[in-house]
């Protein structure tokens, strides 16, 4: 499974990178899942995605999520609307929250997957390096803890990650990068409470991932407008040359 960034109108260089990743991925997979909310309105954003889908021969499964929030008659109307604008391989109304039709989604994925060699062992869950996963866990916990207090313009990089000799513990030093001084204060919180919360939540999940004790230390730095800096974007692991 490749969970691509959402296709959107980019407002900075990082956004452009994310959109390029999503659009390039369309040619590299065996089946595409397009997740939409229940609506019969197809705006410029949706139309742009449809135009991108027309450029590839990959089968596309449209998943209309959150159908538990609308009447059954409306669902039929939404399906008809999307059928008129693109020849989808399948259209599946579903609800991730209520686990409605999720089995059908999985079955349809297998229907369109070709047989091929097993590239990874059965117990392999990802091909990403541990440092990248740890950084993403910290960023995820930060975004959850901060909710809507700051934009998603934060990044995390791992300064140091090393196991202690003869001990079942790993020391991890990481930096949370934001774009504004005001954001730094919010991330740290009163008396460091917010940063402590982020660290505690991240540490718990990292310990589960690595199956060892973790000593996690977090710092917060301001890099003004880093999302428009090619150098910083690349340093944070978003390398456009690898798309």
How does the language model describe each region?
Residues 1-15, 19, 38:
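Switch II (G3) loop of P-loop NTPases
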Residues 130-243:
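P-loop NTP-binding site
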Residues 10, 25-32, 56, 85-88, ...:
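Conserved, well-folded catalytic cores of nucleic-acid-processing
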Residues 3, 22, 33, 95, ...:
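Conserved RecA-like P-loop NTPase ATPase core
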Residues 16-91, 145, 162-171:
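Conserved C-terminal guanine-recognition region of P-loop GTPase G domains, centered on the G4
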Residues 13-24, 41-44, 48, 70-77, ...:
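Charged, alpha-helix-enriched surfaces in structured cytosolic catalytic cores
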Residues 58-61, 67-130:
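Canonical P-loop GTPase G-domain recognition
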């Amino acid at each position: 499974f490749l969970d691509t960034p959402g296709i959107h109108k980019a407002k900075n260089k990082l956004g452009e990178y994310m959109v390029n990743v999503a659009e390039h991925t369309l040619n590299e997979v065996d089946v595409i899942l397009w997740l939409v909310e229940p609506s019969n309105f197809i705006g410029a954003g949706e139309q742009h995605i449809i135009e991108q889908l027309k450029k590839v021969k990959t089968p596309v499964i449209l998943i209309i999520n959150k159908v538990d929030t609308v009447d059954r008659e409306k669902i039929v109307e939404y399906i008809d609307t999307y059928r008129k604008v693109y020849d989808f391989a399948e259209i599946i109304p579903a609800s991730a929250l209520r686990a409605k039709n999720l089995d059908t989604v999985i079955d349809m994925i297998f229907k369109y997957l070709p047989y091929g060699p097993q590239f990874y062992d059965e117990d392999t869950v990802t091909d990403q390096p541990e440092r990248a996963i740890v950084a993403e866990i910290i960023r995820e916990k930060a975004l959850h803890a901060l909710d809507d207090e700051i934009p998603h313009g934060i990044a995390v990089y791992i300064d140091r990650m090393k196991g202690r000799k003869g001990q079942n513990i790993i020391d991890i030093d990481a930096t949370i990068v934001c774009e504004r001084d005001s954001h730094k204060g919010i991330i740290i919180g009163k008396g460091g409470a917010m940063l402590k919360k982020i660290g505690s939540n991240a540490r718990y999940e990292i310990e589960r991932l690595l199956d060892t004790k973790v000593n996690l230390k977090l710092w917060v730095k301001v890099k003004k407008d880093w999302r428009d800096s090619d150098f910083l974007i690349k340093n944070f692991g978003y390398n456009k040359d690898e798309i």
